[in-house]
A protein has these predicted regions:
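The feature marks the mature, well-folded catalytic cores of soluble enzymes
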Residues: 1-338
Length: 338
């Protein structure tokens, strides 16, 4: 599996429409999608899944108003329940086979451990894309979401115990079996296991809210400065694990701390706001920001870590009320050399 910073041929998104996810915020959430597409489209093709032609017309009109590079945007009528393409969409891999260098893994999606049974319908999206793309598909008898794995493209994968060892995913599998499965399906030789995710994350601790590779030897990890915050202990333990972890070559990683925004709530429920939920695309990095005092620091740190890309902050206060942000709703399709 290539690292996210490797060249993309496309980014995949689903157009927001679920009022249960955003009962009062759907209009502002859609504006963030327009911003994402506008920033990404000059650098790679953007595929947007829509439920109906009326939605496609709306997206086209809004992109034209935003003066987006619409020639690089393709709208596809493929129904979805919600927008979390990272988790239910295909996980692309590249291969040495010259006739079919691009393929993807199709995992079982069970609505994040059965929390949202109706969301299991989104498992069909990967199958729909398989018939559209005409690439080899590796279908696996394991529950897994794309947001639970992070790779450096050189042989190392990050994940969390809270998610992949959760009894609501694959209770029949041992840790060693899951470890071996990740190695086989992602083409990695080493798996680094972190512990717990952040409070408010209904995915049971996805790695893409916690720690992210920014190059083959460097990982950025969120830390909580307030020792009284409920995230403090979990994040300190994750940071300590990364400090002693080694990559596929047995070398220690460079670990860069990334701050946490102050706690955010919606209806009394804590939200999983995290600067680690950024998306690395061709030429740009899209970062969720939250009208928070730590926004500028986080953007500055990430710009230093990505000197050859332009880092853009997108206000995600309303998006994260749906319990996810930018990385959760994007899926990269890597370039595959023939």
């Amino acid at each position: 599996m290539p690292a996210e910073w490797c060249g993309h041929s496309a980014t995949w998104l689903s157009w927001p429409h679920n009022l249960e996810t955003w009962p009062t915020k759907l209009a502002s959430v859609r504006e963030v999608w327009i911003q994402m597409i506008t920033l990404l489209a000059p650098h790679e093709r953007i595929y947007v899944l829509v439920n109906e032609e009326r939605s496609a017309d709306e997206v086209r009109a809004r992109l034209e108003t935003a003066r987006a590079a619409t020639e690089n945007v393709t709208l596809l009528k493929i129904p979805t329940i919600d927008v979390w393409m990272r988790d239910y969409g295909p996980t692309f891999v590249t291969r040495s086979a010259p006739e079919n260098p691009l393929a993807f893994n199709d995992w079982i999606f069970n609505g994040w451990g059965g929390k949202y049974p109706s969301y299991e319908l989104d498992e069909r999206v990967a199958r729909d894309l398989a018939s559209l793309l005409h690439v080899p598909v590796f279908r696996h008898d394991i529950v897994l979401e794309g947001g639970s794995i992070e790779v450096n493209g050189a042989g190392t994968c990050l994940t969390t115990e809270q998610c992949l060892l959760n009894q609501n995913r694959n209770p029949q599998l041992t840790r060693a079996e899951i470890d071996g499965f990740l190695k086989d399906s992602l083409g990695v030789s080493d798996v680094i296991w972190l512990g717990e995710g952040i409070v408010g994350d209904d995915t049971d601790g996805h790695i893409d809210d916690i720690a992210r590779f920014v190059n083959p030897t460097t990982v950025t990890c969120i830390v909580e400065a307030n020792s009284r915050d409920e995230n403090y202990r979990f994040l300190e333990e994750n940071y300590e694990r990364l400090q002693i972890a080694v990559d596929q070559n047995g070398a220690k990683l460079s670990v860069v701390k990334l701050p946490c925004p102050d706690p955010m709530y919606d209806g009394g429920v804590r939200l999983p706001a995290s600067y680690a939920n950024f998306y690395i695309a061709n030429e740009v990095v899209l970062v969720p920001i939250f009208d928070d005092a730590h926004d500028v620091e986080a953007l500055g740190l990430l710009q230093e870590l990505f000197p050859n890309r332009k880092v853009h902050g997108l206000r995600c206060n309303d998006v994260v009320a749906g319990l996810g942000a930018i990385h959760c709703v994007t899926q990269q399709q890597p370039q595959a050399a023939r």
